[in-house]
């Protein structure tokens, strides 16, 4: 048995299948950790979701910004962008099935894994963990969002109110909607921030392109860090899968942009990649 963290698939179905063949994935024994953005921008969002849903019992999934964007469009709460590739999925006879499944996924997942060099705690989110968050902060933020998304009475209200760049930092008296919008941005959109968690959400380039006064979230001292904790994230293709920090693992290697889809085996830190073919 092995655990593999998989980078942003974004509808690159054939590359996903090729990567799984390369690692000899066995759904009866292995686990896939999908870092979010399963769909959109790539050529085959429908077949990607259809396939992952079929093997869902062998998958741990966290939601990315594109997955949440899809849910909002599917509820007629948000209009598609011209570059979206969600039409076939939105017209699928199984649309409600896939919506409900995605709504019940997490924004954060963690597990203790026995590795070749000892026990490690792997924690996965789509975009990262802001530097000022403790373990409890992260758990509470993710759980509040999951509870809203999975609740038939609350999820439309959540999806209607999460878009926007403000508030851009934690404040003691934020109302529930503002708090969830900020925390959704931390978990699914963050790249650059300040040490107190103040976000800058416009810049998308490499760390050397950082806005004045901001750093990549992982280059700040992280409150959540401990000796056995390893963080896995996607979202930031411009990093090319590198943070230069041993216990912070970037796994988005830009498949949808013409580069490659990557898998990181948790037990021995080996990386496998499959080049973009479509």
Question: What residue spans do the PLM features occupy?
Answer:
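A short acidic-Thr-Gly-centered motif at the start of a beta-strand
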Residues: 1, 24, 52-54, 109-117, ...
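N-terminal active-site segment of His-dependent metallophosphoesterases
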Residues: 1-54, 68
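Active-site-proximal beta-strand elements of phosphoester/diester hydrolases
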Residues: 3-10, 122-128, 250-251
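Residue-level marker for buried hydrophobic side chains located in beta-strands
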Residues: 5, 34, 61-62, 123, ...
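Divalent metal-coordination and catalytic microenvironments
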Residues: 8, 37, 52, 64-65, ...
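Active-site environment of divalent metal-dependent phosphoester hydrolases
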Residues: 12-14, 40-42, 67-72, 132, ...
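Active-site neighborhood of divalent metal-dependent phosphoester bond hydrolases
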Residues: 46-49, 54-176
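Acidic, His/Gly-rich catalytic cores of divalent-metal-dependent hydrolytic chemistry
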Residues: 139-278
């Amino acid at each position: 048995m092995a655990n593999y963290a998989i980078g942003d698939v974004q509808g690159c179905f054939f590359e996903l299948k090729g990567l799984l063949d390369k690692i000899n994935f066995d759904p009866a024994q292995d686990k896939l950790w999908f870092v979010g953005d399963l769909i959109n921008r790539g050529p085959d969002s429908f077949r990607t979701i259809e396939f992952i849903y079929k093997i869902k019992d062998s998958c741990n999934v966290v939601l990315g910004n594109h997955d949440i964007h899809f849910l909002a469009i599917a509820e007629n709460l948000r209009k598609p962008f011209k570059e979206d590739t969600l039409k076939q999925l939105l017209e699928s006879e199984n649309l409600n099935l896939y919506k409900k499944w995605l709504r019940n996924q997490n924004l954060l997942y963690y597990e203790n894994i026995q590795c070749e060099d000892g026990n490690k705690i792997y924690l996965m989110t789509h975009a990262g963990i802001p530097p000022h968050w403790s373990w409890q902060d992260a758990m509470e933020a993710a759980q509040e969002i999951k509870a809203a998304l999975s609740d038939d009475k609350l999820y439309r209200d959540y999806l209607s109110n999460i878009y926007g760049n403000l508030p851009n930092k934690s404040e003691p008296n934020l109302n529930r909607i503002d708090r969830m919008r900020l925390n959704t941005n931390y978990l699914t959109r963050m790249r650059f921030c300040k040490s107190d968690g103040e976000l800058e959400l416009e810049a998308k380039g490499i760390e050397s392109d950082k806005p004045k006064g901001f750093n990549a979230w992982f280059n700040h001292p992280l409150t959540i860090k401990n000796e056995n904790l390893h963080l896995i994230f996607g979202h930031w293709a411009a990093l090319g899968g590198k943070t230069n920090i041993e216990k912070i693992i970037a796994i988005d290697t830009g498949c949808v942009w013409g580069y490659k889809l990557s898998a990181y085996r948790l037990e021995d830190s080996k990386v496998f990649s499959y080049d973009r073919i479509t």
